[in-house]
Amino acid sequence: MPNPSKILKHSWNKEDDTLEFLAKPFAEDQSVTKRTILSYLGAIYNPLGIVSPTTAQGKHIYRQACDKKKGWNAEVSGELRDEWIKRTKQLKTVEIPRSIATLIGEITGVHFHLFADANLACYAAAVAVVEQKGSMSKGLLTSRSRISKRNSSIARLELVSGHMAANTAKNLHGALQTLVHQFFYHLDGQHGCAVLAD
């Protein structure tokens, strides 16, 4: 990478003006245990939420390993091991534009689009978008994800994901200290919308 610098511990490629998430590779010959999974997940620094979807999947794998009730240093099943190796490989290719506004010029409006979704494994939220005069620039501002609580209904999890999206937008709005003209909420399922309608 030419002229790399760091922004929030992410590598900044100044020529392409992109941020690249640099994860420590997980050696395929390394033992995959509850201890090594938790250690790897704990070492991931992800303040922008760039890799939240992948870390959520890693946490789900950890939960599945815990369900087997094996010791901390016991090898996980072959299926979980293969899934873990697959997910950690995904972390090597994450790269996003550093700036959402791609044109030099006045920003005429900022619109937050909040996307929320949930399933029985996890729920997540993401926030995007900026508008400039004469064009629309779109990009991911941040994302968050959590492992779903056990025995929760889809309707409840969709509401929780929508609430997380709203809280994320509120915190982001305060941090940016800029006027947001509109907020758009996109819930991916009908369960949460039906509950809100009632």
Regions found by a protein language model. Give the residues of each.
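Secondary-structure capping and boundary motifs in well-ordered enzyme cores
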Residues: 33-36, 104-111, 115-120, 153-158, ...
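RNase H catalytic domain
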Residues: 164-198
